[in-house]
From Swiss-Prot:
Topology within the bilayer: Multi-pass membrane protein
Name under which the protein is recorded: Uncharacterized protein MTH_1250
Signal keyword on record: no
Keyword field contains Cell division: no
UniProt main location, coarse: membrane
GO terms of molecular function: monoatomic ion transmembrane transporter activity
Organism of provenance: Methanothermobacter thermautotrophicus (strain ATCC 29096 / DSM 1053 / JCM 10044 / NBRC 100330 / Delta H)
Lineage of source species: Archaea, Methanobacteriati, Methanobacteriota, Methanomada group, Methanobacteria
Amino acid sequence: MMDILIIAEYTLLASLAVFSIAAVRIATRRNIRMGLVGISGLNIAIATILILINRMYGIGFCRDIAYALVLLGPVGTIAFARVLRG
């Protein structure tokens, strides 16, 4: 019988997959601001998925990639917003 924690992890993984699809849909809008929101949401979703994969399967490099995404994602968003502002 599956442990409740394993069921919760797989449920979170499935919901993050749905959120990732929604974030890609938001990012493909014609508005630049909505694109930034969508990419930021996708960044958070992928980082969370990678941390969850690290926790579930013990794959170490997933954690490192997730930390890099979390640290570099806002930097890219701020840089792109400054370029748009002019």
